[in-house]
Amino acid sequence: MTQDQLKQAVAQAAVDLILPKLDEKSVVGVGTGSTANFFIDALAQHKTAFDGAVASSEATAQRLKGHGIPVYELNSVSELEFYVDGADESDAHLNLIKGGGAALTREKIVAAVAKTFICIADASKLVPVLGAFPLPVEVIPMARSHVARQLVKLGGDPVYREGVVTDNGNVILDVHNLQITNPVELESQINAIVGVVTNGLFAARPADVLLLGTAEGVKTLKAE
């Protein structure tokens, strides 16, 4: 199977997982990126089964609206049963690296609100130790150099993501060469640097379920 076919399979599996638990009042949190886009397209086939969605990015909001799915501001929603999103990496404990698409801050906020965070990914994203994929850090623009120096002290090699401005008006530093053996601690350390909005480690609030697309079919993983 191609990578896109694996993504389509896990996207459909996520829809199949949440659909029996949705009703006309349900609002679904939706992530950002290529795998999340497949989820949106699959979810749209059942748009009368739920009320609407909260989007983690402007791009996701546009895709949802294009399918005729109502998009709500998070502040107007009292609870989210599910948040469905992809990942750049996951370990066996369902700690994630996210933010390749630069939407990490809003993704992390929506994930924090959701009762159940379902991560959808192809098998290549499951790794023994996080860090081969560069860790994105969203930074207030004027603090970029300061934050980069602090990230070097933590053992990383930060690279400014040229030409990228987040939906929040900030910039991204991608941190290479990190061996992330304690993701909860590192997430906290990086977030404590003045000028950091947040980083792409989802460890304080990891995924609850990982739907993993493999050649043998979709596997359901819970945190070890």
Curated annotation (Swiss-Prot):
CDD domains: RPI_A
Binding annotation for substrate: 32-35, 85-88, 98-101, 125
Keywords per UniProt: Isomerase
Gene Ontology molecular function, alphabetical: ribose-5-phosphate isomerase activity
Catalytic residues of the enzyme: 107 (proton acceptor)
Pathway: Carbohydrate degradation; pentose phosphate pathway; D-ribose 5-phosphate from D-ribulose 5-phosphate (non-oxidative stage): step 1/1
Domain of life the protein comes from: Bacteria
E.C. number: 5.3.1.6
A Gene Ontology term for the protein's cellular component: cytosol
Family to which this protein belongs: Belongs to the ribose 5-phosphate isomerase family.
Subunit structure, as described in the record: Homodimer.
Task of the protein: Catalyzes the reversible conversion of ribose-5-phosphate to ribulose 5-phosphate.
The name this protein goes by in its record: Ribose-5-phosphate isomerase A
Originating organism: Pseudomonas entomophila (strain L48)
